[in-house]
């Protein structure tokens, strides 16, 4: 298939006799190569049941990258092969509640590990969450490569109406695109849980402004500083009473109360409350 | 060849800033190739639309095909093209780019127009159709397939009632030499032949069918199918082929509808729409290209040439106001653009009781569900302190490895802080103490410039030394309690 960051092929490592996924990354300049390799170093040090394992990183024709950081314009990441990803599964509809719980548990377990190493994923979404259909092991993949390898222009100001959708972005990240904290991964994890239970994306805005509107319709804003910032940034879209039109319980009527309670605690507007 | 040389001559090498000022922050829209901005000609103060592409063969192709077509009054005009080096704020160096100056379409997109004019009539719809068809005819006479015909690519010149409609965005366009086979489409408007090309392409790729010496191809008539879909949406406000679920790829039920040409004229909206209009739609949405209405057939159709009054107000204006419908369409577009693939594979999940999952295995070994709020430890206090010490060391590694976004001084201070914390919890570690001496650590900070990668490597060895006598940390904490205590236990 084609991952978001380039061509991804499955292959067999002939030395280690194991099936691997090989991802080709095209690096257009020295700076992005440097950033990508730094990210790769992070990934290679992460060793956990619920993180996709990166075995090695090679240059063209399988050459060793050691000491030749800036000579290549492509790199190949040899990593653990996983049969499918959560996006493919959700494509087919909802998961059972027990599958969703098992996957969510493993997702949080993986997040706890990387957050304890002070690493942020920053691009958590179903397509970056891999599932082994054999034993239902879930692994988080594609660490930060989307940001490093895809050097697309990112809006540094306030909300924009560009075509790029950011369905798993937390309200803080929508307001301040470069304000990355561990809490943004938790927001994305909450959206993913809701999607596993309902088969639908939780907040699927066509653009950032609408994304924020959808969030405000459902997630209450309780802190004064958040209200002040919203009034400054998008005054015409905020209702004067700060009422939510569709609280989570009404938005997800078929989801059981305990899962709703969990979602209400993880999908808070302020990152500090998450 | 002569066309190519003419095109190359038309591209200017001088800086665009000599003749135009550019509004970098105002974006008019986004095509498949990128955002479109406003620029102003300095000599006349005229406003134009500016599209900036990386200078690549694909971009040159887009420019060439658009320039070939742009002589028609229903196609957005290209004023001139510049080849300049441009550096955006997030880039470290300038890159070669094509800057395409086009006429400004002040009237905006077709759907937006329909939703604003709440009295959009069938006559107006037929007028839009005629102009779109004339634009398409012009392309096809040049043997060029547009391949991305959709309402977003139909723009009004201005806001007057009889403003002309023009076709834009040739990012997917291609000369039809009988070799159109690369699947290029956005959902809702995609022709069945393109879906079939996609299906075969995927099967060949995965080896399910051999790569054919005569690959499956489609032709310019895929644009006519898209035209049929656009007419349908204009008339009633929603697409003919749809799915109940918004999805990141074309859902199976929607694909099946497209492949079989199954659509309806629901009574609620279509009872007030003329039979002539329905006839055009039916004849365009034929699965077999040879059965499909031709361009000339559309232009000759009574619906486009009737002197009869077609003043009935269409329901599309009201339905177009329904934000959920528009958002759904836009969402599908955006997702499809970002993820040009269709998953054919059916994946099924095993029930939990028949799965050998490590988490489930551990729960069986423990024999019971964990108590509220309790981690299961091998050692109580020692492991707690040890965990903190290890976490501080990991923070040092993260600080060394993470890309340095800020100023050097701030980063150095952060490294000193993190190292100080780790030092506080790891004073007894001889390996760490010896290593830090070689990095000029004075107990509170580094006095010299630090090679961060080497420091990270050393700290990693310290962590490995501390964890070797015990099980890896991930096993020591056997279970994680979910944040919401009341959520059902796994």
UniProtKB/Swiss-Prot annotation, chain A:
Its main location: cytoplasm. It catalyses: L-seryl-[protein] + ATP = O-phospho-L-seryl-[protein] + ADP + H(+); L-threonyl-[protein] + ATP = O-phospho-L-threonyl-[protein] + ADP + H(+). InterPro entries: Kinase-like_dom_sf, MAP_kinase, MAPK_ERK3/4, Prot_kinase_dom, Ser/Thr_kinase_AS. ATP binds at residues 1-8, 23. Disulfide bonds: none annotated. The modification Phosphoserine is found at residue 160. Keywords: ATP-binding, Cell cycle, Cytoplasm, Kinase, Nucleotide-binding, Nucleus, Phosphoprotein, Serine/threonine-protein kinase, Transferase. Pfam families: Pkinase. GO terms for cellular component: cytoplasm; nucleus. Phosphorylated by PAK1, PAK2 and PAK3 in the activation loop resulting in catalytic activation. Phosphorylated by MAPKAPK5 at other sites. Its cofactor is Mg(2+). Atypical MAPK protein. Phosphorylates microtubule-associated protein 2 (MAP2) and MAPKAPK5. The precise role of the complex formed with MAPKAPK5 is still unclear, but the complex follows a complex set of phosphorylation events: upon interaction with atypical MAPKAPK5, ERK4/MAPK4 is phosphorylated and then mediates phosphorylation and activation of MAPKAPK5, which in turn phosphorylates ERK4/MAPK4. May promote entry in the cell cycle. Belongs to the protein kinase superfamily. CMGC Ser/Thr protein kinase family. MAP kinase subfamily. This is Mitogen-activated protein kinase 4.
């Amino acid at each position: 298939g084609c991952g978001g960051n380039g061509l991804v092929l499955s292959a067999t490592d002939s030395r280690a006799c194991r099936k691997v996924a090989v991802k080709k990354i095209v690096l257009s300049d020295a700076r992005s190569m440097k950033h990508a390799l730094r990210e790769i170093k992070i990934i290679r040090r992460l060793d956990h049941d619920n993180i996709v394992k990166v075995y090695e990183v090679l240059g063209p024709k399988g050459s060793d990258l050691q000491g030749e950081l800036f000579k290549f314009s492509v790199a190949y990441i040899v990593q653990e092969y996983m049969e499918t990803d959560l996006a493919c599964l959700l494509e087919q509809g909802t998961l059972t509640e027990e599958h969703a719980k098992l996957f969510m548990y493993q997702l949080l377990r993986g997040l706890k590990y990387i957050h304890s190493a002070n690493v942020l994923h920053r691009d958590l979404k179903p397509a970056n969450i891999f599932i082994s259909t054999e034993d239902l092991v879930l692994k988080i993949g594609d660490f930060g490569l989307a940001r490093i390898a895809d050097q697309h222009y990112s809006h540094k100001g306030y909300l924009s109406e560009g075509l790029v959708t950011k369905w798993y972005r937390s309200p803080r990240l929508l307001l301040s695109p470069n304000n990355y904290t561990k809490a943004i991964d938790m927001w994305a994890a909450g959206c993913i849980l809701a999607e596993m239970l309902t088969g639908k994306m939780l907040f699927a805005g066509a653009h950032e402004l609408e994304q924020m509107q959808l969030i405000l319709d459902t997630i209450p804003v309780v802190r004064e500083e958040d209200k002040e910032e919203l009034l400054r940034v998008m005054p015409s879209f905020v209702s004067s009473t700060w009422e939510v039109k569709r609280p989570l319980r009404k938005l997800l009527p078929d989801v059981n109360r305990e899962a709703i309670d969990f979602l209400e605690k993880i999908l808070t507007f302020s990152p500090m409350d998450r | 060849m002569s066309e190519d040389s003419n095109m190359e001559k038309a591209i200017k090498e001088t800086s665009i800033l000599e003749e135009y000022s550019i509004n970098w922050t105002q974006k008019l829209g986004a095509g498949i190739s990128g955002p479109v901005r406003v620029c102003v000609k300095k000599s006349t103060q005229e406003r134009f639309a500016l599209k900036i592409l990386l200078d690549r063969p694909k971009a040159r192709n887009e420019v060439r095909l658009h320039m070939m077509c742009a002589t028609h009054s229903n196609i957005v005009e290209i004023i001139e093209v510049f080849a300049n080096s441009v550096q955006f704020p997030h880039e470290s160096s300038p890159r070669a780019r094509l800057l395409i100056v086009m006429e400004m379409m002040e009237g905006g997109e077709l759907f937006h127009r329909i939703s604003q004019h709440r009295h959009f009539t069938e006559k107006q719809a037929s007028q839009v159709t005629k102009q779109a068809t004339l634009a398409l005819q012009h392309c096809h006479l040049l043997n060029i397939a547009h391949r991305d015909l959709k309402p977003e690519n139909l723009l009004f010149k201005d806001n007057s009632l009889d403003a002309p409609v023009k076709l834009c965005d040739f990012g997917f366009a291609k000369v039809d030499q009988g070799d159109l086979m690369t699947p290029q489409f956005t959902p809702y408007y995609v022709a069945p032949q393109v879906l079939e090309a996609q299906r075969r392409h995927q099967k060949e790729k995965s080896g399910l069918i051999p790569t054919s010496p005569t690959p499956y191809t489609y032709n310019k008539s895929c644009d006519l199918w898209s035209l049929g879909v656009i007419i349908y949406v204009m008339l009633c406000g929603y697409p003919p082929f749809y799915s109940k679920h918004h999805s990141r790829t074309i859902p199976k039920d929607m694909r099946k509808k497209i492949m079989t040409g199954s659509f309806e004229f629901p009574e609620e909206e279509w009872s007030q729409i003329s039979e002539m209009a329905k006839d055009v739609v039916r004849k365009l949405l034929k699965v077999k290209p040879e059965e499909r209405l031709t361009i000339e057939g559309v232009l000759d159709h009574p619906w486009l040439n009737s002197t009869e009054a077609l003043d009935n107000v269409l329901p599309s204006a009201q339905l177009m106001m329904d934000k959920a419908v528009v958002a759904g369409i836009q969402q599908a577009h955006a997702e499809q653009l970002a993820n040009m693939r269709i998953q054919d594979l059916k994946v099924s999940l095993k029930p939990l009781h028949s799965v050998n999952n490590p988490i489930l295995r551990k729960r069986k070994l423990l024999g019971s569900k964990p108590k509220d709020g309790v981690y299961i430890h091998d050692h109580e206090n020692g492991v707690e302190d040890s965990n903190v010490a290890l976490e501080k060391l990991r923070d040092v590694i993260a600080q060394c490895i993470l890309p340095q976004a800020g100023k050097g001084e701030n980063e150095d201070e952060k490294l000193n802080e993190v190292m100080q914390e780790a030092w506080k919890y790891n004073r007894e570690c001889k390996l760490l103490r010896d290593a830090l001496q070689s990095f000029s650590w004075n107990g509170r900070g580094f006095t010299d410039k630090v090679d961060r990668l080497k420091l990270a490597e050393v700290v990693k060895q310290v962590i490995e030394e501390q964890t070797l006598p015990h099980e890896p940390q991930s096993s020591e904490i056997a279970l994680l309690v979910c944040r919401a205590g009341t959520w059902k236990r796994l």
